[in-house]
Amino acid sequence: MPLRYRSDASQTQEAIQDMLKCRFLGPLVASVIISAALTSCGTVTPAATPTATRTPAPVATTTPVPPTATPPPTETATPRPSPAAAAQVPTPLPPDVDPLTGLKVADETLLDRIPVAIKVSNSPEVRPQSGLGSADLVFEHFAEGGITRFTAVFYPNDPEKVGSVRSGRLIDLEIPAMYHALFGYSGSSAGVKERIRHSDLFPDYIAAPDFGVGEPYFYRIPQPGKAFEHTLFTNPAVLRELAEERGINERPDYPVLMTFSDTIPPGGESADYFEVNYLPGVCTAEWAYDPETERWQRSIAGTPHTDALTGEQITAANVILVFANHVYTDIQEDTWGGGHWSIEIQVWGQGPVVIFRDGQFFPGYWKREERHHMLTFYYGDGTPLPLKPGNSWIQLLPLDTESSGVEDGQIVFTPPKM
């Protein structure tokens, strides 16, 4: 019988605890994919956890459905914690600690400004991209046709160039809200544009040619052999100038925070390599642990993934696999190949997570109770699951993603075709 999340918080915790007891016939804890198809435990497909205000739509099918509402916005574009969230206000960090990485910065004034989220292409034609190695956080998610796309969040570090910049998706109604960030992107489909226009991000936290924000905030760099849509670039510094003009270039006041620790937490199991097969041979994210640097090195489909600005391979202190409900909507993104429908990735409520750090993986769950809360991470018993101080890459995956289990320290995650 499929395991399903229940409707209230206590029952949800009970369900997660039950699922944590289910294991592979190998060493990988089944909560690696509390919802996923595990080869030894059978298919476990929970429904998404409801928020306090509505029930999420069912797991995605290939039949488009009307889009579900995003979590209720705050009253204004300025994030404000709800009374319920007030009890969760974290102990303030020292003013020189980056809340998105847990690292101290040399100049604390770099944190007295707004984070900037930028949409970056992952089409093979644009690789290597520019600027991803400088981001605090990078989210990778399905766009359509199996191709993935990135939303990179920059805070203290401002690379000189980021791109190529591409169009936004429904997930970009969520990520800028989580991190109180200005969002820079090239535009969007008509349906996504309307969702953005009616969100609490608009207009102050939105920067796109779609809404009349062109040069000097975005600029073209024509490159031989590259299509026009792959030539748009920007950088966080110039977008912050726009934020300054709008009066929003301020240090965020986050109502909840992630937990960081240099000490390796308990409960991990060894793994020195894993991959996520979004689109095998094209968008396969591969991560190998380097014990000398104590970081995960990223490759794409067998080729080291480098930053065009430095020529260096992209690395991460943490790689976080966030499993969430993926729902096709009635928003059409394009018409090629018979057409593709926009995917709503429901990163609200809570769901399963696997955190890779220090050559180990740690299963647990993620939580986001309010719209302007960032994702936070916990063991099955509700104890905070700390990240390693440093940058993080977040791989967003459907609930019914399959896993190979651990074989010789390696794991393969295979999401359904989308």
Locations of regions flagged by a protein language model:
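Compositionally biased, intrinsically disordered low-complexity segments enriched in Pro/Arg/Gln/His
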Residues: P2-R6
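Generic short N-terminal amphipathic or hydrophobic helices
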Residues: A15, V32-I33, A52
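Sec-dependent bacterial lipoprotein signal peptides
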Residues: L20-T39
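Ser/Thr-rich, Proline-interspersed low-complexity disordered segments
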Residues: C41-D96, D107-E108
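A surface/extracellular/periplasmic glyco- and lipid-processing/surface-interacting theme
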Residues: R80, A87-A135, E144-M418
